[in-house]
Amino acid sequence: MATVTATTKVPEIRDVTRIERIGAHSHIRGLGLDDALEPRQASQGMVGQLAARRAAGVVLEMIREGKIAGRAVLIAGQPGTGKTAIAMGMAQALGPDTPFTAIAGSEIFSLEMSKTEALTQAFRRSIGVRIKEETEIIEGEVVEIQIDRPATGTGSKVGKLTLKTTEMETIYDLGTKMIESLTKDKVQAGDVITIDKATGKISKLGRSFTRARDYDAMGSQTKFVQCPDGELQKRKEVVHTVSLHEIDVINSRTQGFLALFSGDTGEIKSEVREQINAKVAEWREEGKAEIIPGVLFIDEVHMLDIESFSFLNRALESDMAPVLIMATNRGITRIRGTSYQSPHGIPIDLLDRLLIVSTTPYSEKDTKQILRIRCEEEDVEMSEDAYTVLTRIGLETSLRYAIQLITAASLVCRKRKGTEVQVDDIKRVYSLFLDESRSTQYMKEYQDAFLFNELKGETMDTS
């Protein structure tokens, strides 16, 4: 008699790993300063630019103390000298509590709203309001939940909830909505919960330590906490931090809070903003709210036109103005919207209001260190000779071009089953992807073959 063996196929289980995107400045963790605001040569992802980083550290300290609201700083330097990196370092050093808004100069030009409205919204996003609110809560460990369901199956449910602390125990009557909330959050005996008396919101803090030895199936995310002590009913101070722009949007229309998620804010009337400013000033006097002047960073500020610069002059003098940080890589150039030239493409009257921080080109040592940091960020192993070649490419072309070759060289290395990027991999991608100067040279040689060539035998200026 033949025996039949049943085989069960086990499905393949794959680990789902979270992919974190790597950006141009994702390696920056701060400005790399010590307690005396002295910059370290290489720290927190920042390399070189010691004078600029020291100046940024002084500005940062004044922002924290709230003494520099309404001031403006201009970071000026050649392309690829770390202007945006310094601004991102300042944002990281300030932390999540200080509002930081970053925009590009060309973002304000839109058909949906005026330039001044776009700038006003950016300014209001950069000013935070810390609102203090006292709420009454009930905090305790659940001893027992009794729910009485009607025998007929219809009608409202009623029940009792027993809560305790280390010093007292109380029984509360439950209505239908509270029973639904407890059922939805799967609250059971042994859970430590808080109930907001004003809203009825239930929050689970965790399981009580006294239930740690219970024979119960628990997930790895289960958190054990101490049983609360003192009174069951407590007063708790809750601090909400919102930006002025969020308050503007919510009060600008009946369903304003929905516009916060959709982004369709439109133009907000000045009357609404004036009323909000008056209300915030009133809260401030009563001690209910605190103004947090944040930072507005405008990259490529030379793209703004003369009307925008005129608006900035007035906006910086307002009592509710954030610290304005601007970056530009232009020299003496034409102010957009006029026929006049000015340093950095910014009018003289606005330049007079700015603290100007200059950046200098990176040295060979600094360039090599930056490339090492980027390789660590992108998980790329590279030989010392390859670092030297890539550094030379970065000095002869641009730092951005050299950084972009790292990932491409890593892919070429993996295709040949290598573990470490070698000089040949760098040479391969260098020959495949042209930099700006080689691309210009190629176009000069084959300019007649291109459609709509406007060079006409003249020397092309690529400076």
UniProtKB/Swiss-Prot annotation:
Q: What is known of its domains?
A: The C-terminal domain is required for association with ATF2.
Quote the record's binding site residues for ATP.
77-84
What keywords sit in the KW lines? Acetylation, Activator, ATP-binding, Chromatin regulator, Cytoplasm, DNA damage, DNA recombination, DNA repair, Growth regulation, Helicase, Hydrolase, Isopeptide bond, Membrane, Nucleotide-binding, Nucleus, Phosphoprotein, Transcription, Transcription regulation, Ubl conjugation
Q: State what protein this is by name.
A: RuvB-like 2
Q: So what EC number does this one have?
A: 3.6.4.12
Q: What does this protein do?
A: Possesses single-stranded DNA-stimulated ATPase and ATP-dependent DNA helicase (5' to 3') activity; hexamerization is thought to be critical for ATP hydrolysis and adjacent subunits in the ring-like structure contribute to the ATPase activity. Component of the NuA4 histone acetyltransferase complex which is involved in transcriptional activation of select genes principally by acetylation of nucleosomal histones H4 and H2A. This modification may both alter nucleosome -DNA interactions and promote interaction of the modified histones with other proteins which positively regulate transcription.
> Where, by tissue, is this protein expressed?
Ubiquitously expressed. Highly expressed in testis and thymus.
Q: Which SUPFAM superfamilies match?
A: P-loop containing nucleoside triphosphate hydrolases (SSF52540)
Catalytic activity as recorded in UniProt: ATP + H2O = ADP + phosphate + H(+)
Q: How does it assemble?
A: Forms homohexameric rings. Can form a dodecamer with RUVBL1 made of two stacked hexameric rings; however, even though RUVBL1 and RUVBL2 are present in equimolar ratio, the oligomeric status of each hexamer is not known. Oligomerization may regulate binding to nucleic acids and conversely, binding to nucleic acids may affect the dodecameric assembly. Interaction of the complex with DHX34 results in conformational changes of the N-terminus of the RUVBL2 subunits, resulting in loss of nucleotide binding ability and ATP hydrolysis of the complex. (Microbial infection) Interacts with Mumps L polymerase; this interaction regulates the viral transcription.
A single Gene Ontology MF term assigned here is: RNA polymerase II core promoter sequence-specific DNA binding
Fetch the Gene3D superfamilies from UniProt: 1.10.8.60, P-loop containing nucleotide triphosphate hydrolases, RuvB-like helicase, domain II
Q: Does the keyword Acetylation apply?
A: yes
Q: Which family does it belong to?
A: Belongs to the RuvB family.
Phosphoserine occurs at 437
Cross-link position, Glycyl lysine isopeptide (Lys-Gly) (interchain with G-Cter in SUMO2)? 9, 444, 456
The cellular location(s) given in this protein's UniProt record come to: Nucleus matrix; Nucleus, Nucleoplasm; Cytoplasm; Membrane
Organism placement in taxonomy = Eukaryota, Metazoa, Chordata, Craniata, Vertebrata
Mind naming one GO cellular-component term on file for this protein? Ino80 complex
User: Among the record's GO biological process terms, what is one?
Assistant: positive regulation of telomere maintenance in response to DNA damage
Q: Which residues carry this modification: N-acetylalanine?
A: 2
Top-level enzyme category: hydrolase
Q: Does the keyword DNA repair apply?
A: yes
